[in-house]
Amino acid sequence: MEDDRMISLNDDTAHGGRGFAERVARKALQQITPKRRGPMPYLAIGITIVIGLVALGVPVDAQSWQPPADDQRCPSKWGADDERGSANHMKPETVLRATQLIKSGEVIELAHVLSPSIPLVGTRRFDVHTKRTFMNQASNRRGSNEEILISEMGQVGTQFDGFPHQTIADKVYNCFKVDEIASRGGFTKLGIEKVGALITRGVLIDVAGLKGVDILPDTYEITVQDLEEALRRQNLQLQPGDAVIIHTGWGKLWGKDNARYGKSCPGIGVQAAEWLAKQDPMLVGSDNWPVEVLPNPDPQVSAPVHQILLVVNGIYLLENLKLEELAAKRVHEFAFIMQPLKMQGFSGSTVAPIAVR
């Protein structure tokens, strides 16, 4: 009887994700001789691969996400010329639905204070220079002071991501080509000035609370099951047009450990993002800097949640939220109010949203 050879899963260069799975599969197939190439050996090999991946801690459904083709995502459900995406949910009835949640009139601020000491990712900066003037010569001795700010007003602090911010290849939301809408002075379509004021039902999904921790572990991927269990625990269901806010606890590091804050973070993964998109929210926000888990479990994929929500589905992102007070008071449902700055052609905006209950 022919000896069955073991398939080795020990590969010094192996790491999590699709690349590792492919290497294991190739190695397995190489060990199947012509006499053994039938359905049963392939089934055994497949089971061996799955068991090996699980044993090594590699997710079988690793996030090997690839963007859909243009004709699968465009035109937008809001129309081929649409520039507002999920902001189209903003209607009088949306505002009225939100105001019905206000019982005490308490206002909870959801934005961090902007200062030169805030966490900054990549090449972003926030430099403030005080501009002092002398007293003028009028009899009332009026003086004047101002500030000069050198910064990216769209991508610092608590920030709102608009549609030009991310692309799939050379196209943004609704398949507008970057080369055709980008100008020296901003984007001629999809600019943040098109969004307008957003007043809607806000829902805090407290995943850190669900897990019984102050801060979720670094690089923890929030799953669909996490979101569903947290909502059940809070006795809430999502509705179209909601502002969905996810509490990870990562915001506790803001201004205290900026290096750790900006290095990685817990957040939603691909499956959770696709599930949220099906709930048809107005926006998805979190108390971390990219909303999604970083680094991505698949090292070959870069920030796919941004593409899934912004580019494919036309759903806005809200980053670097201050959620500790909201979570501590267990305010899970509230009126959400936010207005992006009216900056023509910008891809995002620094914002100061509030929750009112």
Language-model features and meaning:
Residues 44-55:
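Bacterial N-terminal signal peptides
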Residues 8, 25, 32-33, 60-357:
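Active-/binding-site microenvironments in catalytic and ligand-binding cores
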Residues 41, 46, 148-151:
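Hydrophobic alpha-helical segments and their boundary regions
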